[in-house]
Amino acid sequence: SVLKPDGKNITTVLINATSSEWIGGKFSTPEEYGTQMLEALKLLMKAAGASKGAIVLRSDDAESIAAFSGIIFEGKQLEVAPLIGSRKIGYYFKDQGSDIVVVSQKRIYGKRILNFFTYNVTGKKVPVGCTPADVGVAICGVKSAKALYDAVYQGKPYYETVISLEGLAHCPSQVLVRIGTPFKDVIEACGGYPSESGKLIANGMRTGVAQYTDEVPVTKTTTRISFQKPEDVSRDEAI
């Protein structure tokens, strides 16, 4: 598993909260987001046998940063520290005198994103062909951390998720759907297809996968349903 990989010792657990705002994890308020993520991080650290943990926010997510900054944690007001230059989480563990810190950084895009994320947050370089676990780091997303919190503290199974829709001007930016719901049902519930739709994409435009049918279901890993305009679709001419 991610938390206890065979033959590897996890010393640090990271919750990657740079990919979406607090509402994307089914939280009622930013304050609830902060308190529940801290509790989830404790659970993850215990499961992994890790001594250190950090929640990584996106530097331009002002609402989430404000929510965490107002929390009283371990007897003092929590501070969200920026990852700048050589100041990685190791610096803030010592500076704040805590084994759990909350930091912020810009969102990272591209291939091997988790390896770059690990280096940017911890300063540990992940060798080519290896994973963060090889340098003692386990990474968990907000949705998985929220699901763990709900299961342990509320006895609630993971059967629904929040996804966003891109390319539908008349649709809410975030919708709560049951896992297994076909894409077409989500689209119809949000007012139907746009007048012109060139491509249906699961997840974002940058890293998503084009779908040949709207019968595909929403899964635990679905974060977005995107629509690309016909003029934006690249079509190579046949030779």
Predicted regions mapped to residue ranges:
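Ferredoxin-type iron-sulfur electron-transfer modules and their immediate structural context
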Residues: Y159-T161, F183, E188-I239
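Histidine-anchored nucleotide/phosphate-binding helix
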Residues: P30-A48
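Cofactor-cradling patches in redox/metallo enzymes
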Residues: F27-E32, D60
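Short, well-ordered secondary-structure micro-motifs
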Residues: G25-K26, A66-A67, I113, Q211-D214, ...
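Hydrophobic alpha-helical positions that pack around
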Residues: L3-K8, S51-F183, A189-P194
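Hydrophobic alpha-helical hairpins/lids featuring a short glycine-rich hinge
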Residues: S1-N16, E21-G25
